[in-house]
Swiss-Prot record:
It is an enzyme of class 2 (transferase). The keyword Acyltransferase applies. It comes from Helicobacter hepaticus (strain ATCC 51449 / 3B1). Its EC number is 2.3.2.29. Pfam families: ATE_C, ATE_N. One of its GO terms (molecular function) is leucyl-tRNA--protein transferase activity. Keywords: Acyltransferase, Cytoplasm, Transferase. Functions in the N-end rule pathway of protein degradation where it conjugates Leu from its aminoacyl-tRNA to the N-termini of proteins containing an N-terminal aspartate or glutamate. Belongs to the R-transferase family. Bpt subfamily. InterPro entries: Acyl_CoA_acyltransferase, Asp_Glu_LeuTrfase, N-end_Aminoacyl_Trfase, N-end_Aminoacyl_Trfase_C, N-end_Aminoacyl_Trfase_N. It is found in: Cytoplasm. This is Aspartate/glutamate leucyltransferase. The keyword Zinc does not apply.
Amino acid sequence: MRLVEFYSEKKVCSYIDSKQSIFRYFHIQNVTPSFYYGLLERGWRRFGNYFFTPMCEGCTDCISIRTLIDDFTFSRNHKRLLKKAQNIDIYIQKPTITQAHIELYNRYHRVMRDKKGWEYTPTTPESYMDMFVEGHQDFGYEILYFIDSQLVGVGLVDALFDSITAVYFYYDHTFAHHSLGTLNILKQIQIGKENGLKYFYPGYWIKDHYCMGYKQRFTPFEVLKNIPDVFEAPIWEMYNG
């Protein structure tokens, strides 16, 4: 395992315009599942061979959370959505790249640029490989969603020991009425239940945020209370509102 540490440049936060963000990165070739799991427990996320965590000055709004899978109960609306999804073909496999992936990814981000002001640069096959295919090893998977043989959603996930963690999800907004984002989270929790997993990590949460607040709907969940370094113990506590 080879690790290179670096920091991003300070820039305007993608989620709170009045603040600036900076991230600590590890670039790790051939990461071991146990080392990755240790990072995950300490609030790190993964894209490709890159692992990162926010280190923003004077701000801790991005909170690492994890849903308790065994204690999660599917609501009536959740069950209705899962039943409705029986008409959607869902496949789980190792991460791949096709022209359909690239086109869907770029379509999704064009919409998000217009809808929420996201920065948009069309991805290339090389960039997509670097961020979503490389580094998946034995723990990385993609969940593919098809409607009438058309790729309409891609969920990248990692499964590590007792946990499943959402890496990224993008979808076709033409099919937004299928609530694909919520469906993708429910499928991951469902997979966790079926495989006896303990935690679902949905990524960073900003309470009541227009873009990041939705994660608080999947309860019960724990929050990471400290900002531990790599060899410091993480402190997780149940969130009570």
